[in-house]
Amino acid sequence: MFFSALFVSCDSDDDDQLVEVVAPATYEFLREGVSTVSFSGQTTRLNQADAIFNALNSKADDGSGATKFYTEAQIDAMFADGSGIMNAALNGTGKKIRSKTSAGCAAGNSATQAQFDDQIADFVANVVPAWTADASSGVPGKLTDATRSIHVNGMGHEIDQTFIKGLIGGMCLDQIVNNYIQPCQMDSGTRRDDNTNGILSSGKNYTDMEHKWDEAFGYLYGQVDNAKTTDLSTNLSSTGTTLFKYLTKIEGSNDPGIAKRIFDAFKLGRAAIVAGAYDVRDAQANILKIQLSKVIGYKSVDYLEGYMSKMSAGNTADAFHALSEGYGFIMSLQFTNDGNDAPYFTKAEVDAMLSKLSNFWTVNNSDLTSMVSQIKSKMSI
């Protein structure tokens, strides 16, 4: 078993005390032999996101693969209210996705929530009625090539992809880097003093600050089996469709070692909270902001380049599938964090890029190449 440790100086009335912060091999933290880690709410929301992803492909939201057509009201209820989902365990929990989308305490922008609402409405009003029709420029329907078939709106957007990839940034990343690891959550009210003095949340075995960090952890690892006792720098297996899935892809391609950097930062940051070493906590938070944001940058580039490659091969459906994913990841760029609590791309910059991607049938490769260059340059990837 491997451990990482830092020594930090803490002020006292008499002298400087050296505090050792040791990160365990896994994310297992105990108090009197009982786990202090809890992120069940995040697991619920990630599972709800998977259900909506299925519904936006006219598949039963339980993941069975059966064809099922939903009304706008039904999908809206899943998104806004956490209700109407076939898996009863995901209903009536009080956990809702929409209210956690673009809602970070450091950078909330509730106007972005309407973009997700609009995608749901577009899917039901335009894509579903044309499910078996042939798609063409300006005409929604089914688009098929030698590699796949997809269902698109009149602009060529595959909405299950634009929605879920946008949610990766709008909920998962935003809740981590712009909310739970931020001082506006960590140190809100009396949380810092309570944590220092070992005052636990009412009826719980953890402090409020410990729990906030764990909630951030859950938005990345919440669908991994045995996440608290597994080496998450090497065990990269999960059933979900959100941020962790794409971290594993980047680990295996663009940036080997990124999974370890992120897992180590989560562990050491949590250990620092237990030790009351808040400078160490904040240093690990900055690592998480930058490294997790890179996942969004890498995948934005990958899918833009993938579109151009697939189009040159004559596979329009496959290309539009890739560009739909790219569209969603570009939506997600506004939720990145450069370590100084600024996004790598502002909402205005993102909206300008999305405008150039509004019609896949007429998209310009020179615009995509320019976007790729901007993302690589700004994010140093």
Segments (PLM) and residue ranges:
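Mature extracytoplasmic or organellar-lumen-exposed domains after removal of signal/transit peptides
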Residues: D16-I381
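C-terminal motif of bacterial Sec signal peptides marking the signal peptidase cleavage site
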Residues: A5-S9
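Bacterial signal peptide processing site
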Residues: D11-D14
